[in-house]
Amino acid sequence: MTKLTITRPDDWHVHLRDGDVLTDTVRDTGRYMGRAIIMPNLVPPATNVDSALAYYERIKAVCTTNFEPLMVLYLTDNTTAEDIRAAKASGKVVAAKLYPAGATTNSDSGVTDVKNIYPVLEAMQEVGMLFLVHGEVTDSSIDIFDREATFINNTLKQVVADFPSLKIVLEHITTKDAVDFVMGASDNVAATITAHHLLYNRNHMLAGGIRPHFYCLPILKRNTHQQALLAAAASGSKKFFLGTDSAPHAKDRKEAACGCAGSYTAHAAIELYAEAFESVGALDKLEAFASFNGPDFYGLPRNTDSITLVKRSWEVPATYPLGDTGVVPIRAGETIDWQVED
């Protein structure tokens, strides 16, 4: 296959950051994504409807396409049921996000114990707001490669049991454990999968030298988990959909003695997913994963226009602009096999 036309995709998990970098991040994500779920882990985080709506306006102010940001509340131990009801009433906030305190970038204000937000989850279940989950424990005694599976067993299974009508997205899954859990759970439980977790495993990050631009959270796992993710994405199951978790950091914040977690893929997201699906002979499953399963789960209409991918190799720049600095993208200086037709 040398050409593939699909319904315009959406990104159900992206970090746009804030301030002077928005022009660059919104350009890259909005180039061919119709909508995106915007992560709220700013400094300070978007913890209430007012801060979420103000962030929405800052994003829209730099949009040059019809791209529509879908806003998310950042949950804390102090979030209230009234915060949820106000966010739902806004029409712009579609979900609320659990960051276990300290799990990832700018998560220090997150939830210290999920039981602290049970009244909030009750309100979310009542009003029909989705619950997005960064599924890792933060206990320093738990091996970093085991933190997702431990979170599922110790926390998420109980939440799913306690809130059977709550729609839950386990974000950026990285393990066979997560695939099996989502597949075995009710139709109210789904997951996003990133392009980099489909294309890479921990050998790419650690073998033959440390490659900091592959360092993200949840961390890349062994190749058996990568294969499980590919099988899930290409299975045709409606429970899995596109979420890039594209997370820009300035070059010097990544190439450092203590580098930041996050991989940048917004420059070529759908192209990278096309490579991943092609690698398992499943290009025919890409459209549902990228364009149908997400809006269907969120109860939103599918996009009505389309994009066309062509099999044409192109070289990725060494950096992309990021405010007054630069971000090193995944596949920098290398080629990608697919390209979106202008």
From Swiss-Prot:
Residues the record lists as binding Zn(2+) 1: 13, 15, 97, 245
Catalysed reaction equations from the record: (S)-dihydroorotate + H2O = N-carbamoyl-L-aspartate + H(+)
Q: What residues form the membrane-spanning segments?
A: none
- Catalytic residues (UniProt): 245
- What is the uppermost EC class here? hydrolase
Q: How does it assemble?
A: Homodimer.
Q: What does this protein do?
A: Catalyzes the reversible cyclization of carbamoyl aspartate to dihydroorotate.
Listed name of the protein: Dihydroorotase
Q: What gene does the UniProt entry assign to this protein?
A: pyrC
